[in-house]
Amino acid sequence: MQPPFRLFGAELSPYSVKVRSYLRYKGIAHEWIQRSAARQEEFSRYAKLPLIPVLVGADDQAMQDSTPIIEALEAAFPEPALQPQDSGLAFLSALLEDYADEWLNKAMFHYRWTYPADQESAARRIVAMMFDGGEPPAGLEDSVRSRMAGRLHH
């Protein structure tokens, strides 16, 4: 994969923001593309699964899943290094990344979808991003809210 890159993602996706932060840290040229109904056809050309982020290179090669994306980019763009040189610190860094990736999102989802005011706010923002300011179908916010809140296991 070669730059410039196109990154399909969403502001509310911790995995999308993780890859965008990495690209900014490295100074790697990229275009942020908000995944939305208007961009669905383009997104579908590259996505193997309906999940974000999707990173597309100038060669039209695409990757999904934030950790493998960053690992591939780190191999291609090693400076500045993401991981410390010291093996002990590198281990701790990898451990923290894995913990944050796999477990801290549970706290994020809890606070986004447990309390009614947060549910309403998150559903409203998700629907607004999906339709880029266009008119969404009636009841979509309620549908998103009930679907996502129903996924929590308390």
Write out the residue ranges for each language-model feature.
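GST-like domain detector, emphasizing the conserved glutathione-binding G-site
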Residues: 1-139
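A conserved mid-domain beta-alpha-beta active-site/ligand-binding segment of alpha/beta enzyme cores
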Residues: 138-154
